[in-house]
């Protein structure tokens, strides 16, 4: 009898957990503070982000990024978004591009 109750409680807990994990979030308020400084949340975007040490990325291993540097910012060696002009050894005429992977 005790093991049946335990199994039932465990089953209900698992179903509740799955429901929470798969339910859509109706409010965008959770995004506030989710990303770091100079970053913006974008769950639909895929590709290689601009970096100080790679101004023309062609391939990257990170495909599920949801926090992207805001326009005019790139990632430095510590993965912080900084202004393009603050990158070390960057000429003023250097253009940064990014590779976007289609859905």
Curated annotation (Swiss-Prot):
The keyword Signal applies. Residues 35-87 form the TIL domain. InterPro entries: Ser_inhib-like_sf (IPR036084), TIL_dom (IPR002919). Keywords: Signal. The keyword Signal applies. SUPFAM superfamilies: Serine protease inhibitors. It comes from the Viruses. It holds the Pfam family TIL. Residues 1-22 form the signal peptide. Belongs to the polydnaviridae EGF-like motif protein family. This is Probable protease inhibitor Egf0.4a.
């Amino acid at each position: 009898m005790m093991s049946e109750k335990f199994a039932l409680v465990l089953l209900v807990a698992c179903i509740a957990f799955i429901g929470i994990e798969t339910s859509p979030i109706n409010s965008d308020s959770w995004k506030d503070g989710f990303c770091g400084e100079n970053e913006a949340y974008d769950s639909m975007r895929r590709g290689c982000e601009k970096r100080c040490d790679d101004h023309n990325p062609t391939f990257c291993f990170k495909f599920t990024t949801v926090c992207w540097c805001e326009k005019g910012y790139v990632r430095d060696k510590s993965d912080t978004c900084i202004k393009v002009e603050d990158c070390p050894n960057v000429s003023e005429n250097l253009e940064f591009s990014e590779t976007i992977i289609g859905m």
